[in-house]
Amino acid sequence: MGKEQELVQAVKAEDVGTAQRLLQRPRPGKAKLLGSTKKINVNFQDPDGFSALHHAALNGNTELISLLLEAQAAVDIKDNKGMRPLHYAAWQGRKEPMKLVLKAGSAVNVPSDEGHIPLHLAAQHGHYDVSEMLLQHQSNPCIVDNSGKTPLDLACEFGRVGVVQLLLSSNMCAALLEPRPGDTTDPNGTSPLHLAAKNGHIDIIRLLLQAGIDINRQTKSGTALHEAALCGKTEVVRLLLDSGINAQVRNTYSQTALDIVHQFTTSQASKEIKQLLREASAALQVRATKDYCNNYDLTSLNVKAGDIITVLEQHPDGRWKGCIHDNRTGNDRVGYFPSSLGEAIVKRAGSRTGSEPSPPQGGGSLGPSAPPEEIWVLRKPFAGGDRSGSLSNVAGGRSTGGHALHAGAEGVKLLATVLSQKSVSESSPGDSPVKPPEGSSGAARSQPPAAHAGQVYGEQPPKKLESSSASEGKSAEAVSQWLATFQLQLYAPNFTSAGYDLPTISRMTPEDLTAIGVTKPGHRKKITAEISGLNIPDCLPEHKPANLAVWLSMIGLAQYYKVLVDNGYENIDFITDITWEDLQEIGITKLGHQKKLMLAVRKLAELQKAEYSKYEGGPLRRKAPQSLEMMAIESPPPSEPAAAECQSPKMTTFQDSELSGELQAALSGPAEAGAAAAEKSSNHLPATPRTTSRQESSLSGRARHMSSSQELLGDGPQGPGSPMSRSQEYLLDEGPAPGTPPKEVRSSRHGHSVKRASVPPVPGKPRQVLPSGVSHFTPPQTPTKAQPGSPQALGGPHGPATAKVKPTPQLLPPTDRPMSPRSLPQSPTHRGFAYVLPQPVEGEAGPPAPGPVPPPVPAAVPTLCLPPEADVEPRRPKKRAHSLNRYAASDSEPERDELLVPAAAGPYATVQRRVGRSHSVRAPAGTDKNVNRSQSFAVRPRKKGPPPPPPKRSSSAMASANLADEPSPDVETEDGRLGVRAQRRRASDLAGSVDTGSAGSVKSIAAMLELSSIGGGGRAIRRPPEGHPTPRPASPDPGRVATVLASVKHKEAIGPDGEVVNRRRTLSGPVTGLLATARRGPGEPAEQSHFMEDGTARQRLRGPAKGEAGVEGPPLARVEASATLKRRIRAKQSQQENVKFILTESDTVKRRPKAKEPDIGPEPPPPLSVYQNGTATIRRRPASEQAGPPELPPPPPPAEPPPTDLMPLPPLPLPDGSARKPVKPPVSPKPILAQPVSKIQGSPTPASKKVPLPGPGSPEVKRAHGTPPPVSPKPPPPPTAPKPAKALAGLQSSSATPSPVPSPARQPPAALIKPASSPPSQSASPAKPPSPGAPALQVPTKPPRAAASVVSGPPVASDCASPGDSARQKLEETSACLAAALQAVEEKIRQEDGQGPRPSSIEEKSTGSILEDIGSMFDDLADQLDAMLE
């Protein structure tokens, strides 16, 4: 170790001898002798930069310091921190070492690296003599260190009274006490008074006050009172208040000292401080004359009569801010209360007494005009009384603080955090208009201080209590008192810190209690029990406020306005989309506030849904869940050209559960209540409303139902007499109705409606609100939902249909609709309902003209009619456009516009159409199922007792294939509006209305109706593509055919594929009829065969046959049966014009039973059908819907390719039928349902059958016009392959045969289903037979259903004929009014048989009757299905 290091060590160890030895000069002679003349380095520094002099100064050893200085040691050498020996000498505090160093010439004002000069260190450590010596050597006491503190600041902070006196006596005192610029903004800004107050140095505070420091000097944290209050320095607070500090001054966070105490301190000392501050800040005390509580306003003060309230200030709106001290608990509650609530206890003396007649008036003198002294006086009484008077000597000081009171009221913004609850601070006056959301409190803050002070004691009662909840203080006390009632007040902090008030606590769950720290099971159980006993209203607004700020204020969470706005929730409509996760993400973390917000959001969403359902049925549209099957068309009215159809515009899916009460209400005025019930119940809860609708025997009642369903579906023209439901209006408009809820709202609603979707609405009750001619109404998206609703409305007469519709999901666009598994399964059942409703409506209301119906359809947003090849009105294409919205409705599936042709058929078609979308078709497994949802199918089977087990997957696959095929035909022609695919799609949707212009409309309709009863008729009857006029000419009344097809199509549309849905249904469940027909064989009665093959087709035969008695009679019926089957498939694909069969609804029901494909024999399986077969069952319904469109078969040649299962159907759509049918049993997107059936039945067979059976558009489809539609057996879509075989077997005879072919695959299920399905089919049949003409009656819809249920061909054959009669009988039994309506329709159809297109209108009416019957059946089936699903 070198000598330098030895020297440093010796000095450090205060070894003077060694240091002297090392520092001695060697003798010259010796040095020379030794050769060491080297001198030691006295300034050597160790690694820390310390030299020997540093150590000597730090140790205070004067001998070593002198020795080193003599050795020429540098006096101002710096260590690594910039500290010089003088710094260490000052720090050490010894006078002699300081003298030595100062004498050596050390600089006194050179700072260290931290900015400290020696005086800082001496003052901080209280070295009076050293400080005095430094001052004598001209040390500057105003130099600030890096933290902005002067030596005086440090002395005050550390309580060095002597040094403070020394510094204050220096000539720099005034400069030291002057406020520095930037103190209020500099985070480090401070003052000697703040530091002394913060640390409780009372003597120093007195010295500073005597020296003349500004007592109200402010920094960023506020005044010294803020610091003392926050740090709990009670005596300092008292001293400052006695010295006249302004207790109203607010810091940069808009907090007063009292606010800070409320918010941040909980110690015992804080209670006394609160009292002191209350007294100092209050200018008046009042006694409450009555109870007051406003739990909606976070800033309000809950008081009881007799409470003593210390008035703190007045809000600009006239309310007073007061504080109530609870002597028992020591808690303070701060908040606003009406100025009229209290009476002054003491009238203050002074300038203010005169102006203080009453508490409200007293504030006047406090106004800015009042001198500070006056204000001081106001506060003084409290101070004098409570503070035992340092008031006397404070009067002067207070004069300075008097204005502070005003300033506090005026100047500073009050943050929510200031109050105990953060809302207290918000409520405090003087807040600048910091937060509009804060409402009244915000207003108060915005008021200027003077004005505020003047009003402090509120001249008039508050104009409004804008904050929504009691202030935190009052809420905390209320919670504490409540907990005290059962000795668990120890949890009060848990509740209050989490932001819970009593109204929110009353909605807490045990999980919520655990989340806030109530972890002891015994305590949690006790609190839960007490919560259950709380009877506190939710205090949530009962109406939708104008904006977010008002809403937040109403629920007492105005402090979150800025947070919500900053995060994109500035619109009151956006807030309904917020979730718990969103609240957490944007920083609203208090569990109580989160819960209150979510409760309020839920209530707001309910209000919005109610509003939309009331004005637009909007909630329905919104609610549409993911299920795409039931899609209402919102696109332009069917009047639009084919282009509209192609656009597949605004069809939103109808999810069964989505039909909420609101939706139901929207769908049918009378059924609104029922709808709500339905929503609550499962899919079928609305059964009662449906029954009611069905029970309406009078035509007027029917018309009413029809109007509602038409409204929903936008069916074609309704009789002017028949009112159109609101939904229909929207649908007819096909454009967003003015009332259409905004997309945002829709989305929010959508979330809510998803749950509802599972519950079928009670559409059964028609919305009588709208006149039949409501077509001019523009349905908002509600129409989409409304359309299913319309089927419901139509089904309304048939209670079951109504209940099942649950089209609410429909309202939402397919995308909007959440696809919930539950929703999807339920949707099949609901769909059934939806379909049913439209048909009964049509049948019921004479107003909808068979042919003209389509024109009115535009009025109803949902244009259910496919654009007829020639007859179909332009708006039918709209249906196509609507198809876009519903995913299930594939191109092959006719849009609602098409279905719209006949009012009843249109609605029917609409529902089904949703299901049978090209998309659905293409997405066989997931999408199709969801799309098909078996809603309509499931619903229908329910009507007749337990629905048969769900159809086998094979039928589903077939249906899917059909759907897939349909789209291409739809595109090709669809009545010139859309390609065949588009037509088919419409045909599916508009089962009845689509084929209005196709040939053989009456018989096609009958066949479609039959298929409809089975569930596949619609598709079978699918009208031929535009390119195939031949089938069209065959149909006498395109309108009628369209009507029938519409109904048929509806059934089909619901199929899992979308269009094949109905067919599937027929194949799996209702397919029983198709299978029965096939089994029956070509030789068997066509009617029976049709019913067996496709309820839709058979119904169509029935309706058309009756209407067309002259045209073809039974033969046509037969041909139609097979044609209907194929058409149905086709209808799904192309949605032909003939798709208008209303029977499709019934058929769907039948198919539902037949959905037994899984071999679930009992009717009850349909619920399963809805899921497994569900697709098939649903498809059935789509088939019904598409049954209506079957007349479109010609237009939907593409439908043929898509429907693998629908192979026969594709031919049906083709005018030639045989040539047109897609031979392959394509497994549409729903291979599960369609493919299995297809495989079982064999795709080859369907292909062959298809040859015999012209496409739905083929003559048989058009057969309604007189030409048997071989492709009619569209119903067999599920067993597409078999159906084609049937078609090949023979157009007319083959109708039965094709059914049998599919039956092989499905036969076991069908057979199983037969028993269960028969009753439903019969039930549906009765409704259907009346609707068709006499011949149609021969092939009663019921029989088709029975046939469908009796999957076996032969039994079905026998059932077909007799079931038609029995169906009619059953219809009469079910509802005399339905029977009468059906008879009237039949007569009309008969009259129109020779007329050609006329039969279509007659058929529409008959279809409406059939729909009613179907509705009845659906009611039964729905009930059964509900039971099964449950």
From Swiss-Prot:
UniProt keyword annotation of Repeat present: yes
**The SH3 domain covers which part of the protein?**
281-347
Report biased composition (Low complexity) as residue ranges.
667-679, 1283-1298, 1308-1326, 1344-1358
Q: Where is the composition biased (Polar residues)?
A: 421-430, 683-711
Q: How does it assemble?
A: Polymerizes, via the tandem SAM domains, to form long, 8 nM wide fibers, upon which other proteins can assemble. Binds the CaM kinase domain of CASK. Forms a ternary complex with CASK and LIN7A, LIN7B or LIN7C. Competes with APBA1 that forms a similar complex with CASK and LIN7 proteins. The tripartite complex CASKIN1/CASK/LIN7(A/B/C) binds the cytoplasmic tail of NRXN1.
Compositional bias per record (Pro residues), positions renumbered to this chain: 847-859, 1027-1036, 1190-1214, 1267-1282
Spell out the Basic and acidic residues composition-biased ranges: 1147-1159, 1388-1406
> What is the recorded name of this protein?
Caskin-1
Q: Cellular component terms, GO, for this chain's entry? A: cytoplasm; glutamatergic synapse; postsynapse
- An example molecular function term from Gene Ontology annotations: identical protein binding
Key word Cytoplasm present: yes
CASK-binding: annotated segments: 375-471
Q: Where in the cell is it found?
A: Cytoplasm
Keywords in UniProt for this one?
A: ANK repeat, Cytoplasm, Methylation, Phosphoprotein, Repeat, SH3 domain
Q: Which InterPro entries has this protein been placed in? A: ANKS1/Caskin, Ankyrin_rpt, Ankyrin_rpt-contain_sf, Caskin1-CID, Caskin1/2_SAM_1, Caskin1/2_SAM_2, Caskin1_SH3, Caskin_C
- Report the residue ranges that make up the SAM domain in this protein: 474-537, 543-607
| Modification type Phosphoserine: residues | 358, 423, 432, 635, 648, 722, 727, 790, 890, 892, 988, 1068, 1258, 1362
Q: Which residues cross the membrane?
A: none
Q: Which residues carry this modification: Omega-N-methylarginine?
A: 398
In the record, which positions carry Phosphotyrosine? Answer: 253
Which gene is the coding source of this polypeptide chain? Caskin1
- GO process annotations (BP): regulation of postsynaptic density assembly; signal transduction
Q: Which residues carry this modification: Phosphothreonine?
A: 740, 1066, 1267
Q: What does this protein do?
A: May link the scaffolding protein CASK to downstream intracellular effectors.
Which residue stretches belong to region Disordered? Answer: 348-372, 421-472, 667-1001, 1015-1040, 1055-1371, 1388-1407
